[in-house]
Amino acid sequence: MIIRRPEETWIQKCSMYTFVKRILDIVIALSVCLLLLPFFLLIILLLRISGEGEVFYRQTRIGQYNKEFRIFKFATMVRDSLNIGTGAITLRNDPRVTPVGKYLRITKINELPQVLNVLLGDMSIVGPRPLVMSTFNAYPALVQKEIYQSKPGITGVGSIIYRDEEKLISASSIEPKIYYEKVIAPHKGEVELWYNKHKSVLTDVKIIFITGWVILFPQSNLIYKSFKDLPKRDF
């Protein structure tokens, strides 16, 4: 007599995924801290002797279940930048960005201190990007309700697809905040919700690989080749 093993429930699968994801997050975050420590020290030195001497930038972001937390980033802009110019919207060649900060932003190195948020449990390596309240409010109500059922991530499908967000906003004749709200936010919300529905260890591993790939090859369309049903961007 063959006894069939009962299929795992959605809750069991979700719990297993959450457990494995947390282990991977800790392993990757610790590895980054240890391997890149000398590099981090060099960046800290450069930031101390250039610009305004600021090293880390702490900012309140929306996290899992829409709870706020404080994010770590390398400082790339002048002090009080949120209250200057376009606020939370950053433009290409934004005058608020410091000389060193410009290169940190292009290479996304400014995001690496968020491994500390990963170790603290506020963030994951992969997930929807954590937003400030003003840009979070640009999302449709359904997206606001669902997007942070997953922990926010250092990278994710939204981060990859909109890696040229600053360029898009700068090239538009529409006022930046309106362009973000009317054009970018609706589609960006769609792709972040796509991740929530398709998240798995394999999906996360693919996204991590694709993140590295598009940093080296910015024009690559690998994200859409890897995930065929990902909502397409038509602008």
Question: Model-derived features: where do they sit?
Answer:
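A hydrophobic, helix-centered structural microdomain
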Residues: 2-3, 8-81, 195-235
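Short, glycine-rich, amphipathic interfacial segments at transmembrane boundaries or analogous
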Residues: 57-96, 158-186, 190
